[in-house]
Amino acid sequence: MCQYSATNGLVNDWHIVHYGTRAVGGVGLLMLEATAVAPEGRITRFDLGLWDDNQIAGLEKITRFAHEQGATTAIQIAHAGRKASHDSPANGGKQLSIAEGGWQTVAPSAIPFDSTEIPPHELNEVEIEHIVDQFTATALRAKQARFDVLEIHAAHGYLIHQFLSPLSNKRTDEYGGSFENRKRLLLKIVTAVKTVWPQELPLFVRLSATDWTEGGWSLEETVKLSDILYQQGVDMIDCSSGGNISTAKIPLSPGYQVHFSEEIKKTGVLTAAVGLITTVEQMNSILAEGKADMIFLGRELLRNPYFPIVSTLGTDREIEWPIQYLRGK
């Protein structure tokens, strides 16, 4: 989950300790937060970035330490689109104008996320191709930073999701209108990224399975897209939802997004379930019933970074404790 703690996109001590602690805590896959492919693609000016070579070394410190603890490492690469240029959540999270230190946002269409926000610039086709190049260059840097898994963030109302949804994409060119056109940007990014990301390393895509709004991006379209991505060599779909429509009513409850994972899994692609999954019993049930192949934890690991090793203590699947912590068993 985003830490909103970087300066100029660079890793600092907070990130090293934060992610290192979760690696010590026994996570199998350590997924870094949404990391911007361009400065203007940041949600806030405090986001991590990987748009420049000078950002590689800090991230490699995280991957090196995590590998030493036995964790596999992953990174989400993202462009926030119209949801960029915000203050940090701790400061209220409002969108910032250029005069307030923000920047011009971009989107498939000049439709703001919220009526109180500044309309984004509608991208032209040359600018869209440049964004594809930015994702590709960032993927190459992720490889150089020694990540084991790459995830393209196409969910939560960020730029790629904005192109997918007919509520935020009103274009009349090859990137808008039909399902075939609205998925074009994501498929171009996947194709381009696969030219630099090693074939033997997994490639994930995070999708919002629904906009939770009539006329928006739907589960049916997500299942169809997931099948196409699977055929194109995507290894796993990270199944989330929402984030694109400010007025959406999301029925929150334990495991409320697991159904999406279960449906998408029918295409044959591996899936990860996420969202209000907080107990070992809940996780084991999801996996045993074949509703997902992997469980992603977010807020639970904010509350308890040692959740994996503590939860398996005394079971037949006990995770090996760091020798420095053996006196705590």
Language-model regions, residue ranges each:
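Flavin-dependent oxidoreductase catalytic cores
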Residues: 1-329
